[in-house]
Amino acid sequence: MDIDVVVLQSLDKFIEFSEPDEFSIIRDFGQPQRYFNSSVMKWNNDFATEMIWEEYQKNLEHYKTLQGDQNVITDAMNLHGKKILKPYPDEWTFSYKWTHRKKPKFGEASRTYEVVDDASIAVFHGKPNPHESTQDWVKDNWK
């Protein structure tokens, strides 16, 4: 889990969600059908290392052309990991900036900075960061 997330509820369901031989990750907020967001992930090194790290090392020049770890992970999962991929339910996380995952990217997402009911994690991708927020719910939960 990234350090720039705000935990609002217990994380137990994230731990219990997938089996040891599955890779769990949240879907991207801007292009959820195409990419993953690496802010919240869970995997077992016994099998995921080969699919991500060893794949990255083997095809380093290709992966250097991609922007950021999220794109590397998405590419590696699309290449090797579909059978073990189990994305977390969208309603468990939300973007601080965009209330709903929308397609196309930067659709008519509102910027109300409100908590999404029943979500456990608010993801701060890009700017602002949690310590820059003026919302009380962020200040109360960012520790």
Give the positions of each predicted feature:
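Residues that flank catalytic or metal-binding motifs in active/ligand-binding sites
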Residues: 1, 36-39, 69, 117-118
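GT-A fold catalytic core of metal-dependent nucleotide-sugar glycosyltransferases
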Residues: 1-35, 42-43
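Short, glycine/charged-enriched secondary-structure capping and boundary segments
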Residues: 14-16, 38-40, 56, 136-138
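Residue-level preference for the first positions of well-ordered beta-strands
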Residues: 23, 40, 119-121
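A glycosyltransferase accessory/donor-loop signature
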Residues: 45-143
